[in-house]
């Protein structure tokens, strides 16, 4: 595994879980953490430790979002009417980089952020280069014409390890996707269990 590939899986190793369901994840080959002490029996986590781990896993899944930004997303989820854990997931799945990843225009969520930042994506016909840009139901996301033949894009749409969820409609011939609706937690195809209610408990201490 190259240094670049290894860095992409540091979150998997830290969590001890294959959080993106990738075939090459190092945790597929071992059930212990990284480092020389990784094979020691894991001690039972405290309530705080469990909550912290849930937060780190959710942050990591969306490209290791910075704490300040993630806290701001949580704060908005808390202010909104309805269930805070559901609001949190809805806000995360509404991010432009998350939608580009879900639509299979790129192979990883990290690649999605870079792809957006480099100006390869339009929303409703306007170029947007901010990965955290929040999309609304009905928004149309498209890959710029000159970017459609990039090797990473052509390879990504062929990935068999994940499907496009039903809250996104994707046309891989035209490289266009529509964000149909904001999903509920149960709609999101996480390869591992995500526990946003524990994130709420963490920030509510």
From Swiss-Prot:
The keyword Secreted does not apply. Residues 1-16 have a biased composition (Basic and acidic residues). The keyword Electron transport does not apply. Residues 94-157 form the S4 RNA-binding domain. GO terms for cellular component: small ribosomal subunit. SMART domains: Ribosomal_S4, S4. CDD domains: S4 (cd00165). Gene3D superfamilies: Ribosomal Protein S4 Delta 41, Chain A, domain 1, RNA-binding S4 domain. Signal peptide: none annotated. Pfam families: Ribosomal_S4 (PF00163), S4 (PF01479). One of its GO terms (biological process) is ribosomal small subunit biogenesis. Keywords: Ribonucleoprotein, Ribosomal protein, RNA-binding, rRNA-binding. Residues 1-46 are annotated as: Disordered. One of its GO terms (molecular function) is rRNA binding. Belongs to the universal ribosomal protein uS4 family. One of the primary rRNA binding proteins, it binds directly to 16S rRNA where it nucleates assembly of the body of the 30S subunit. With S5 and S12 plays an important role in translational accuracy. HAMAP family: Ribosomal_uS4_B. Part of the 30S ribosomal subunit. Contacts protein S5. The interaction surface between S4 and S5 is involved in control of translational fidelity. This is Small ribosomal subunit protein uS4. The lineage of its organism: Bacteria, Pseudomonadati, Pseudomonadota, Alphaproteobacteria, Hyphomicrobiales.
């Amino acid at each position: 595994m190259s240094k670049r590939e290894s860095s992409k899986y540091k979150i998997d190793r830290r969590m001890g879980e294959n959080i993106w369901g990738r075939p090459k994840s190092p945790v597929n080959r071992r059930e212990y953490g990284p480092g020389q002490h990784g094979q020691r029996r894991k001690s039972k986590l405290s309530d705080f430790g469990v909550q912290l781990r849930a937060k780190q896993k959710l942050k990591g899944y969306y490209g290791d979002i910075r704490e300040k930004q993630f806290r701001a997303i949580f704060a908005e989820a808390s202010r909104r009417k309805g269930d805070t854990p559901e609001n949190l997931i809805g806000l995360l799945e509404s991010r432009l980089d998350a939608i580009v990843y879900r639509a299979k225009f790129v192979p990883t969520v990290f690649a999605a952020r870079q792809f957006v930042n480099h100006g390869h994506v339009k929303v409703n016909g306007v170029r947007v280069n901010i990965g955290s840009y929040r999309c609304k139901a009905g928004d149309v996301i498209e890959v710029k014409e000159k970017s459609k033949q990039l090797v990473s894009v052509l390879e990504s749409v062929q990935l068999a390890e994940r499907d496009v969820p039903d809250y996104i409609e994707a046309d891989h011939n035209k490289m266009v996707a529509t964000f149909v609706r904001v999903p509920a937690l149960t709609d999101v195809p996480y390869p591992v269990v995500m526990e946003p209610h524990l994130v709420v408990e963490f920030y509510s201490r």
